[in-house]
Swiss-Prot record:
<dbReference type="Pfam" id="PF02704">
    <property type="entry name" value="GASA"/>
</dbReference>
<protein>
    <recommendedName>
        <fullName>Protein GAST1</fullName>
    </recommendedName>
</protein>
<dbReference type="InterPro" id="IPR003854">
    <property type="entry name" value="GASA"/>
</dbReference>
<keyword id="KW-0732">Signal</keyword>
<comment type="similarity">
    <text>Belongs to the GASA family.</text>
</comment>
<dbReference type="GO" id="GO:0005576">
    <property type="term" value="C:extracellular region"/>
</dbReference>
<keyword id="KW-0964">Secreted</keyword>
<keyword id="KW-1015">Disulfide bond</keyword>
<feature type="signal peptide">
    <location>
        <begin position="1"/>
        <end position="25"/>
    </location>
</feature>
């Protein structure tokens, strides 16, 4: 009788420890996914800008266009991802590859 009780307790202990390990692995995976989402939110660290620097850079970048609202919207979206905005009001995208290579579904440039 005592032998059976020991085996049952041992099996319960093994099941408990296994569930504990699985739970820890799931928590670590969730934390890693959250960290990846946070990195996507603040850029790929390609550029040197801080997220708060995007507004003034995009304001200058879009200063000469007649489509200011869409230009600012996409410029800020691109800056948040790439953490850089090319110099000047047009062109110079080679200085910011992430900004240059982000395309729309149709294959056109996403960033102004």
């Amino acid at each position: 009788m005592a032998g059976k009780m020991s085996i049952v307790l041992f099996v319960l202990l093994v099941v408990f420890l296994t569930q504990n390990q699985v739970s820890r692995a799931n928590i670590m995976r969730d934390e890693q996914q959250q960290q990846q989402r946070n990195n996507q939110l603040y850029g790929v660290s390609e550029g040197r800008l801080h997220p708060q620097d995007c507004q003034p850079k995009c304001t200058y970048r879009c200063s000469k266009t007649s489509y200011k609202k869409p230009c600012m919207f996409f410029c800020q979206k691109c800056c948040a991802k790439c953490l850089c905005v090319p110099a000047g009001t047009y062109g110079n995208k080679q200085s910011c590859p992430c900004y240059n290579n982000w395309k729309t579904k149709r294959g056109g440039p996403k960033c102004p």
